[in-house]
Amino acid sequence: MVSKDSGRCILTTPEREVEPAACLALEMRYALDPNRQIKKRNKALQVRFKDICEAQNEQRDTQLSSGPLGEKREAKAVSCRVAYRKYMTVPARRSIPNVTKSTGVQTSPDLRKCYQTFPLDRKKGSLKGLPAADAFKSQNNGFLADSKEKSEAGPMEEPRPCSAGRIHKTTALVFHSNEHVNALGQPSGVNCAELCKSPDVLGYPEAVLQNSRPPSEEPIHQLQGRAKLDRGTLDSEEPAPLTHGRVFKTEVATVYPPAISTRAPEPGLSNSAAASQWSLCPADEEQRRAAHLNGLQASTGSAVACSTPVQYLSPECSEQPLQNQPSPTAGIGDEEHQQIVPHTEVVDLKAQLQVMENLISSSQETIKVLLGVIQELEKGEAHREGLSYRTGQDTANCDTCRNSACIIYRYVNILFPLCYSE
């Protein structure tokens, strides 16, 4: 009998030990459930607030029933403070949501859509995010790609045969206006014997090329007759593309490095290496001859006439005749080049300053809005805790306020001298 009882006790003891362990595991799992915790916390908040209100009412009733009027008021204030202090010191106050972290309201517009940050985007295509770029359509600020230059030439121009090998230096600051066409290019060729068959490659007929002797070797009446003849042939052959203006080749040294020539270039050519090497239009021919006839520029020495068409040569052979060919429009090209380049640089600086001003003002407005939101949140928190809230930041009068602790004041002092220091 004893053995049976002891055996029964041995068997039943593990069962009794397993049951509390399973119950404890279930309770822990149930207690660690986040939804369960949130429900318990909300319930505790409701019960605690209800108990506090009932306690306040009980204290108020007991004090109103006995005692004079002044003591009643003082006791009422003390009871309210005690109850509020008790309510605020309970650890479950952590369940009150943090408004500054939980609210994801966007109080300011997205600045990326309105303004582009610096440095400017130099990808192929167009300038992104520069609102002032369209105001200066007549200037090429060096960031536009080859497609932009082709579109500026207009639909009048047909695709040219040798346009596959044209050399462009778009990142160099090449300035031209809307009526200038990008006819500055050279067809690709392997050796010097290859010539382009079509005379329309650079928009320059052979009649002008044969007349490339310097004006000093021709009489005046031949010059006038030849100018009329050139104008007539050009009007009959190409009426549309040659109505454009002068083409400048501004950075010759970086695009085409000069070859060592057998003959030294003339003094008139040395001053115009960066301005204009040759002219491509009948208006330029007329200007050249008019300048020579009026005595604006005297050609010194004898020039070497080009026997082969200079513009149809490959890039290897086209450098030497360029230096040997005289350029009577050197002084005029220099003047126009000096007039255009500083003007465009000033325009680009103005556009960049305008964009920076817009960016700074929008950022300042954003800071004002965010400061207002922060102040409202802090004021609400202070009123909930029974404190008085006072701030030294007056965002409504930012222009007149000079509070050194304000972030807007520091922001303006740091950024605006950067813009207007010059």
UniProtKB/Swiss-Prot annotation:
Record family assignment: Belongs to the INSYN2 family.
Coiled coil among keywords: yes
PANTHER family: INHIBITORY SYNAPTIC FACTOR 2A (PTHR28682:SF1), INHIBITORY SYNAPTIC FACTOR 2A-RELATED (PTHR28682)
Pfam families xref list: FAM196
Protein's cellular compartments: Postsynaptic density
Function: Component of the protein machinery at the inhibitory synapses, probably acting as a scaffold. Inhibitory synapses dampen neuronal activity through postsynaptic hyperpolarization. This synaptic inhibition is fundamental for the functioning of the central nervous system, shaping and orchestrating the flow of information through neuronal networks to generate a precise neural code.
Name of the protein described by the UniProt record: Inhibitory synaptic factor 2A
